[in-house]
Swiss-Prot record:
Swiss-Prot/TrEMBL keywords: Repeat, WD repeat
One GO biological process term: iron-sulfur cluster assembly
Gene: CIA1
SMART domains per record: WD40
InterPro entries: CIAO1/Cia1, WD40/YVTN_repeat-like_dom_sf, WD40_repeat_dom_sf, WD40_rpt
Comp. bias regions, Pro residues: 1-12
Source species taxonomy: Eukaryota, Fungi, Dikarya, Ascomycota, Pezizomycotina
UniProt superkingdom: Eukaryota
GO CC terms: cytosolic [4Fe-4S] assembly targeting complex
Official protein name in the record: Probable cytosolic iron-sulfur protein assembly protein 1
Region Disordered, annotated ranges: 1-24
Repeat found in the keyword field: yes
Pfam families tied to this protein: WD40
Stated role: Essential component of the cytosolic iron-sulfur (Fe/S) protein assembly machinery. Required for the maturation of extramitochondrial Fe/S proteins.
WD repeats: 70-121, 161-200, 213-267, 273-319, 340-379, 411-452
Natural source organism: Chaetomium globosum (strain ATCC 6205 / CBS 148.51 / DSM 1962 / NBRC 6347 / NRRL 1970) (Soil fungus)
Amino acid sequence: MPPPTTPTPNPSIPQKATLTPLPPFQPDLYQRAWSSIPHPTLPLLATGHAKSVTVFSLATLSKHSALTGGHARSVRTVAWQPARGGGTGGGSGGKRLGLVTGSFDATAGLWSFEGDADAAAGGGGGGLEREVRMGGGGGGGGESEEEEEVREWEFNLVLEGHENEVKSLAFSPGGQYLATSSRDKSVWIWEDVSSGQGGDDEDEWETVAVLSEHDGDVKAVAWCPSNLPNARAGVGRQHNSSEVLASASYDDTVRVWREDADGEWVCVAVLEGHGGTVWGLQWEGKERQDGRFPRLMTFSAGRVRSRVWTLRVSGFGGVPSTMRRSLREEWDCTAVLPKVHTRDVYSVSWSADTGLVASTGSDGIIAVYAEESAPEDVAKSGVEGGAENGTSGPKSNWKVLGTITRAHGPYEVNHITWCKRFDPGAEHKGKEEMLVTTGDDGVVRPWQVRIS
């Protein structure tokens, strides 16, 4: 019998990731920082810490501006506000640059960047580079009162209703809805009922739903991205909701929510299987080759820390029917990421460009994963069901490309995100990705990622 041969690696699948620390963002915050959120199109990064938010320039890796005075306790979570009617929330057309903050004081706050919005948001490209360099924290001094005024944020509106701290918040892709979650076990959905399209119009939001089906703190909320063809077309959907929300909880479950035909927000699926608190979740942002609905990744405490969930496609397909279909959905766990972490996973980021996943947590480890080719035969994958019962497709396998230990020394790492590079060391500014981690040490650290 001939000796077994080693399989030849698939050249299309990355085999190794090398992480190299870049100079940290300046200045150091010297206090626990919770998360750093990149703007979807502009070279800006918002970091929540203490009672404020520091906005960094991705072009200079230094401070651009700060949001202070809106909260009585620490800012736990931050999100960039999409422009009304869609878009990216700043720059062209005179639309404001906006942020929302969630705090331990049980409120959420809406902020706007005052001054030349077009310059601040990069109208035409050159304006933002001048603005972020002007706002760099290099201690250059000599700024005029007028220049200082350009970088001011205004606290426009406070959203009250939660009984305890706001753990997470997220805007729907079009900006119409804002979801907030709290230690009070609830998810609130707010609707933007402002009349204008930006400029000097006042923010006006009203509560449209309070979702109280979780049995524990709701740690995170996330809206399914709508920029993917399969999400826009409603592939795999069982009714006409245009927005899909997922929530993760201390009760060890994830819930999926949609708006029904009567305009009520309802739970359409409960994802169970984690053996501990589900700390958060991430929707797949890269279009799937099989044209299916975006998958959902969840991460938690417990033995199995990171799972991938896939919506089971209805076996009815496009056959017309006069019967009203159930809003109930079936989601299957179709992948479990390899075990790397020794303690709770606090944060995962799923790149919309490459499909690579990065994770971090209380053990201070950073891990990067790639998805390997899925099995060709659905039956071999262990997924049950057929044309009649519906399927979620074949299961997939993931591999670890690389790890870093003690990413922030002895401190826990609270957040990780993929982020476009605009700094002088980038080979392809605005296209090349790096990782950014945020820790208990108050350091916001960028990492160069080399894939081979």
